Amino acid sequence: MALSVEEKAQIVAEYQQAAGDTGSPEVQVALLTANINKLQGHFKANDKDHHSRRGLIRMVNQRRKLLDYLKGKDTTRYSALIGRLGLRR
């Protein structure tokens, strides 16, 4: 269920701010979004998997915290990230 090494490397390369950047909020939110989307597909087939659902809720909360941080720090980067990931309205 987790992202493969290749998928993770592709996401990091796409959202990094500079070479070697793996910890910026953009990269972290993009990785969490990919994991969340993958888990949503899992729940379509396994709707009673409550243990994994708790992990999904934790990921959603972590993503929300990172987005709140980025929104307070730099609204232009926040808006660009939301648009690229297709989150929100």
From Swiss-Prot:
CDD domains for this protein: Ribosomal_S15p_S13e
Name of one Pfam family that matches: Ribosomal_S15
Keyword Acetylation in annotation: no
PROSITE patterns in alphabetical order: RIBOSOMAL_S15
Domain of life: Bacteria
SMART domains for the chain: Ribosomal_S15
HAMAP family to which the protein is assigned, alphabetical: Ribosomal_uS15_B
Protein name per UniProt: Small ribosomal subunit protein uS15
Gene: rpsO
